[in-house]
Design a protein with these regions (language model features):
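Eukaryotic tandem repeat interaction scaffolds
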Residues: 238-386
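Ankyrin-repeat boundary/"N-cap" motif
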Residues: 21-31, 52-65, 87-97, 121-133, ...
């Protein structure tokens, strides 16, 4: 009976989400065609609401911005009823966040001229300018628009980093560095943890850039290895990058940050990392290392979509039933993220099916949480492609 009820609920939820997606303006494929204002008006005339959002709070204007729609089309959408420069979208971001993220200088200037708040922070505490910088945007013209609107060029953001440090990873030829140096920033800037420009540049895995920084006297820190492991939003670094940092720059392969994380904490849920994982296993990096929240690389790997890394970790696991500060085990991670293969691997290793978290929740609760209606899976893996 319970099973039938759950299936019925899942079916109803799927139908609901499907119904929500009938608005053609919410179809990502529509925006791949660079539609004109006239094309959008035609769809609106058919009854498609230009202010609607999908299940992940990406509204139509956000989709248009993230798919680099024509400026006139985006401007038209911003001015439609239900849309505004203060409208909150995914992660409580306003349109200025997305315009800056895409490096759309014309749109940034337009939104600022309409009164968009250059200091507005999303749910992660990120403002439009640092959101852009940390996602690879380094064009001076766009930052000029922010500075002219009153944004302090030397403002400190997350962990005491400035825009220059965030943008450095994408500044292959250090051209933006010259620009930011005229705004009170320099290659000698560090964040609150002493991370240098070298560490921030390591995120890109650009060895040529890293060598340029060394030539300029910028010292590396152990955290550079962890920055490299984090990579960028859509790209991961190569084995060559890690070998350069460990074997030439002489950063310890077992380096940890202040949160107690090693490279495995960042690599364990990324795809196509098998050779890199094997390299660091050979260097003695600990798969059982718990960070300050009690999370281990094994737990993170158990929650990944692929099981290749988990399989590499399992022979080195000391206690498969280790729990983090919330009382979650590797099996909890696997169940919550809906990975039957990972669950089977952990059970074969002796994982306890009766595990409960600190709130007394058993695996059944996490199984319910693992349910994702059809149509939401893609957005949950890479929402910016929505």
């Amino acid at each position: 009976m319970k099973k039938n009820l759950f299936v019925s609920f899942a079916f109803a939820a799927t139908l609901f989400v499907s119904a929500q997606q009938k608005n053609t303006l919410l179809d990502a494929a529509f925006w791949k065609t660079s539609p004109t204002v006239e094309t959008v008006q035609t769809e609106i005339a058919k009854g498609n609401n230009p202010a609607e959002a999908n299940a992940n709070a990406f509204d139509i204007t956000t989709l248009a911005i993230n798919n680099d729609a024509p400026f006139a089309t985006i401007k038209f959408l911003v001015e439609q009823p239900g849309n505004s420069i203060t409208k909150l979208t995914h992660d409580n971001r306003i349109y200025l966040h997305w315009a800056a993220y895409r490096g759309n200088t014309d749109l940034v200037q337009y939104l600022i001229a309409k009164g968009s708040d250059v200091n507005f922070e999303d749910s992660h505490g990120t403002a439009p300018a640092d959101f852009a910088a940390s996602n690879g945007q380094s064009a001076p013209a766009m930052y000029d628009a922010f500075f002219k609107a009153g944004l302090n060029p030397t403002k400190k953001y997350a962990n005491g980093a400035n825009l220059f440090l965030f943008a450095l990873a994408s500044d292959k030829h250090l051209k933006a560095t010259d620009y930011f140096s005229t705004k009170g920033m320099s290659l000698k800037d560090v964040d609150n943890d002493g991370n240098t420009a070298f560490s921030y540049a390591a995120r890109s895995g650009n060895i040529a850039l890293l060598k340029k920084l060394l030539e300029k006297g910028i010292k590396p820190t152990d955290n550079a290895l962890l920055f490299a492991a984090q990579g960028s939003r859509r790209e991961t670094n190569t084995l060559e990058t890690y070998k350069y940092l460990v074997e030439e720059v002489k950063i310890k392969a077992t380096a940890q940050n202040k949160a107690g994380q090693n490279v495995f904490h960042f690599l364990a849920n990324k795809p196509n990392q098998t050779e890199i994982i094997k390299y660091f296993l050979g260097k003695g990096v600990d798969v059982n290392k718990a960070d300050k929240e009690g999370n281990t690389p094994v737990m993170i790997a158990a929650g990944a979509r692929e099981t290749a890394i988990l399989e590499l970790f399992l022979p080195s696991v000391k206690n498969i039933n280790t729990q983090n500060l919330k009382g979650e085990s590797a099996l909890t991670f696997a169940v919550r993220n809906g990975s039957p293969d990972a669950v089977n691997l952990l059970l074969a290793k002796g994982a306890d099916v009766n595990v409960k978290d600190k709130d007394g929740n058993n695996l059944g609760v996490y199984l319910v949480q693992s349910y994702r209606p059809a149509g939401r899976e893609k957005a949950s893996t890479d929402p910016f492609d929505a």
